[in-house]
């Protein structure tokens, strides 16, 4: 005589094995989905709260007035960032000499009304990438998006600047900077911050060793951003892949 429930008892371990296997199989996809949603929410919040330079309708004058340039938002913050960029250029980036230096933001960035310490948004149409951008390449910032290396220029544009922006070559199932090495000469890279959107074009790519600091330093007279990620893919970071981008001439105003 067969005992009741015997077949069910035999199926339970198989069901558990199936569910565990399914969870493992779906983990990268689900993680990528939720990472993308989190980044998307941060970007949406940034664009929804960034100053536009225009006043609400109820504050606009009833009589027409002559057109004027909109006021610069947070002028004291902008001046602080510009001064930092001048300082590191003039001292030759002497403190760009360790991992700890790249993790430390040169300027504590926190603006009322903005989400945490998010600085802006990096957009690369050629690889359909849009990510939050932070100052200081800490582990937390790198998990949340792309991050400017401390002791390199802050990405607001200007002569004698080179903002080095790092991103994981894939992280927790999401691509991050995985496809950055596929960029071609002439591809566009845009950095949106509270003061505008400087536009850049890819002018050079190269592979360097992790300790090649000179390759990421400011180049006198130029307005650059340099994208940096590990290379080869899934190698544990044996080398670094650089994508060097220069400000488009019509945009090079600051």
Question: Could you describe each region identified by the protein language model?
Answer:
Residues 1-5:
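Terminal targeting segments of Actinobacterial cell-envelope proteins
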Residues 6-196, 200-254:
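Solvent-exposed, non-transmembrane regions of membrane-associated and secreted proteins
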């Amino acid at each position: 005589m067969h005992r009741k429930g015997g077949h069910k008892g035999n199926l339970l371990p198989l069901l558990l094995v199936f569910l565990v296997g399914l969870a493992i199989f779906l983990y990268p996809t689900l993680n990528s989905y939720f990472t993308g949603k989190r980044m998307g929410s941060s970007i949406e919040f940034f664009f929804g709260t960034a100053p536009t330079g225009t006043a609400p309708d109820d504050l606009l004058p009833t009589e027409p007035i002559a057109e004027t340039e909109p006021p610069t938002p947070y002028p004291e913050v902008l001046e602080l960032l510009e001064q930092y960029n001048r300082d590191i250029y003039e001292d030759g980036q002497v403190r760009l000499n360790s991992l700890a230096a790249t993790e430390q933001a040169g300027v504590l960035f926190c603006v009322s009304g903005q989400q945490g310490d998010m600085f802006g948004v990096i957009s690369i149409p050629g690889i359909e990438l849009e990510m939050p951008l932070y100052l200081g390449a800490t582990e937390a910032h790198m998990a949340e998006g792309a991050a400017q290396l401390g002791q390199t220029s802050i990405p607001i544009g200007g002569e004698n600047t080179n903002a080095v922006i790092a991103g994981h070559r894939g992280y927790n199932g999401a691509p991050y900077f995985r496809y950055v090495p596929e960029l071609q000469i002439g591809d566009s890279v845009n950095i949106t911050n509270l003061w505008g959107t400087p536009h850049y074009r890819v002018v050079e790519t190269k592979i360097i060793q992790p300790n090649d600091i000179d390759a990421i330093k400011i180049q006198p007279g130029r307005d650059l951003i340099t994208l940096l990620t590990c290379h080869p893919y899934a190698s544990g970071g044996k080398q670094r892949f650089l994508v060097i981008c220069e400000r488009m001439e019509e945009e090079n105003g600051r």
